[in-house]
Regions:
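An N-terminus-focused feature that recognizes amino-terminal "leader" regions
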Residues: 14, 33, 49-52
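Short glycine/proline-centered loop/turn elements that form peptide/ligand docking sites
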Residues: 25-26, 43-49
């Protein structure tokens, strides 16, 4: 297989951190003291049930996503519970040019996809998630989000 056969993964889109309910604003303020700027805020409903804040530092796509669960049914709330209630690293996100091609390619390669098809994400994106223990040959050990802008 050549590089031309692999759908274009462009760059890291963001790193996500799960924060406990009530900790979002103190963390946003702390990152602002370090020079980060808030560039997006949204309550993401549906499957995700989180409050999202995107922070940027410097120029370019240097984004940190803070995720606060809106309720106990949120996947982020369950992730925080599994970590002993501490919160912390949630996932990395990779930007692609064509989400459907990336989805089809990863499915063909045997990756365990957590979504049956690409779906609407926050800020007008289309996304799907890849399981941390995805194939017999590959176990990332952490969740991966694949993102297409607009």
């Amino acid at each position: 297989m050549s590089a031309a056969d692999i759908p274009g993964f462009l760059f890291f889109d963001h790193v996500a951190v799960a924060v406990r309910q009530g900790d979002l604003e103190p963390q946003v303020n702390a990152y602002k003291l370090l020079g980060f700027t808030e560039v997006h805020r949204e309550d993401v409903l549906g499957k995700d049930q989180v409050r999202e804040v995107l922070l940027q530092i410097g120029a370019g796509p240097n984004l940190l996503q803070l995720l606060e669960p809106l309720n106990a049914d949120s996947p982020v709330a369950k992730q925080i519970e599994k970590s002993g209630g501490r919160g912390g690293f949630a996932h990395i996100a990779l930007r692609v040019a064509d989400i459907q091609k990336a989805f089809d390619y990863m499915k063909e390669q045997g990756f365990k996809l957590l979504d049956p098809a690409p779906r609407k994400g926050s800020r007008g994106t289309t996304v799907f998630f890849v399981h941390p223990k995805t194939t017999e040959q590959v176990a990332f050990g952490y969740l991966i989000e694949v993102v297409q802008e607009g």
